[in-house]
Design a protein with these regions (language model features):
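Long, distal/terminal scaffolding or interaction modules
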Residues: 1-225
Length: 225
C-alpha cells in the first residue's frame, strides 16, 4: 500500500537470512538484518527499505567480506537497500528504480539496469554495467582500477563534478552510514572533499541527452573501445 509512511512497520532480524529477503517489499516496510543474507535480496523491491549489517559481535572487516548474495535487487522498481559489506555477482541486475549502497560486488554488476541509483564503496568485478540502459552508478575507486572492469559498449565514465550529482551521492552515503554504522562510509564522509575525487560516475550513453542535470564533463568520458 503506497499510502503508508516510510518505516511504518520495522522488522528486526538477526542471523543469516535465506533467499529473497524483502522480495516485493512495499513502501512502509523496513527490514533490518544484523548478520547476513543469501541470494535475491530485495527481488522486485517496490518501495520498502532493507538494511543489512554485520552482527555487533562480528570482528570481520565489513568492506572486505560478502554480506549479501547474488542477484540482489533483481527487477526492483523502488525503495532502498543499504548493506555494510560486499554483494555477490549480478548485483542490481534489471534494477529499474531502487537506490542502493553496498561496499563492493562481484562480476556483472548493474547488468541490464534501467533505472535507480547504485553506489558501490568498494571494488567491482568484471563486466560491470553490461546492457545498462538507465539509472546512475557511483564507484569508489581510490586505486584507479574500476574503469578496466566496466563494459564500455554502452557506458560513459567521468568524475563526479556537478553539484547535483555530488549531492545525490553524498546523501546516499550519509543514509548508508546512519542505517548501517558503516565504518567505510563514515571515513569517506569525514574526509569528503578529498574522498569525492576518488569516485567515478557511470551513466549509459543513451541517457546523456535525457538528463535534467548534465554530467558536465562528457568530453572527458571514457570512449567505447
Amino acid at each position: 500500500n503506497n499510502s503508508l509512511q516510510d518505516n511504518h512497520l520495522t522488522i528486526k532480524l538477526s542471523g543469516s537470512a535465506g533467499q529473497s529477503l524483502g522480495a516485493f517489499a512495499t513502501r512502509g516496510l523496513k527490514l533490518e538484518v544484523s548478520g547476513d543474507a543469501n541470494d535475491y535480496v530485495g527481488k522486485g523491491l517496490s518501495g520498502g527499505m532493507i538494511v543489512v549489517r554485520p552482527a555487533l559481535a562480528s570482528r570481520l572487516v565489513a568492506a572486505q567480506n560478502t554480506i549479501i548474495g547474488n542477484t540482489v535487487l533483481y527487477g526492483a522498481t523502488a525503495g532502498y537497500l543499504f548493506a555494510a559489506g560486499r554483494a555477490g555477482e549480478r548485483f542490481a541486475v534489471r534494477n529499474s528504480g531502487a537506490h542502493v549502497v553496498i561496499e563492493g560486488c562481484g562480476s556483472n554488476g548493474c547488468e541490464y539496469m534501467t533505472g535507480g541509483v547504485a553506489v558501490i564503496l568498494g571494488s567491482i568485478g568484471a563486466n560491470f554495467g553490461a546492457g545498462m540502459t538507465g539509472g546512475m552508478g557511483y564507484l569508489y575507486d581510490p586505486d584507479g582500477v574500476a574503469t578496466s572492469r566496466l563494459n564500455m559498449e554502452t557506458l560513459v565514465s567521468c568524475p563526479v563534478a556537478v553539484p547535483h550529482w555530488q549531492g545525490q551521492l553524498k546523501e546516499l552515503i550519509e543514509s548508508h552510514a546512519a542505517e548501517t554504522d558503516s565504518e567505510r562510509a563514515s571515513n569517506i564522509l569525514q574526509n569528503w572533499d578529498l574522498e569525492l575525487s576518488k569516485f567515478i560516475q557511470i551513466c549509459p550513453k543513451e541517457m546523456l541527452n535525457k538528463l535534467i542535470h548534465p554530467l558536465g564533463v562528457e568530453a572527458t568520458s571514457i570512449p567505447a573501445e
